[in-house]
């Protein structure tokens, strides 16, 4: 199984995985409007891989099979105050 990964022009660190190059027919229109003009980032073989860097391989394969696309969102930003307070043994409100 192969997939094509596209980078969003509207949202940093947001990627759209589809089964075929330039085939967004199964991607909802609203998602495409929010995603912007897709910029191809890479063609990726999924078979034989054990993992992906920022996505769960099995979830990607399942989403591609069931809905025809997978949307990778940026990781949540780190809450430095919460981390600092935890290191100090305190809780944030």
Curated annotation (Swiss-Prot):
It comes from the Bacteria. InterPro entries: YcgL-like_sf (IPR038068), YcgL_dom (IPR027354). Residues 1-85 form the YcgL domain. PROSITE patterns: YCGL. Gene3D superfamilies: YcgL domain. It holds the Pfam family YcgL. PANTHER family: PROTEIN YCGL. This is YcgL domain-containing protein KPK_1976.
């Amino acid at each position: 199984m192969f997939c094509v990964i596209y980078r969003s022009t509207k949202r940093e660190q947001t990627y759209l995985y589809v089964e075929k190059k330039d085939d967004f027919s199964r991607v909802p229109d609203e998602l495409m409007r929010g995603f912007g003009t897709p910029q191809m980032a890479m063609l990726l073989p999924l078979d034989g891989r054990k993992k992906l860097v920022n996505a769960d391989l099995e979830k990607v394969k399942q989403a591609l099979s069931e809905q025809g696309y997978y949307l990778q969102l940026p990781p949540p930003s780190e809450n430095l105050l919460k981390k600092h307070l935890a290191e100090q043994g305190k809780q944030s409100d």
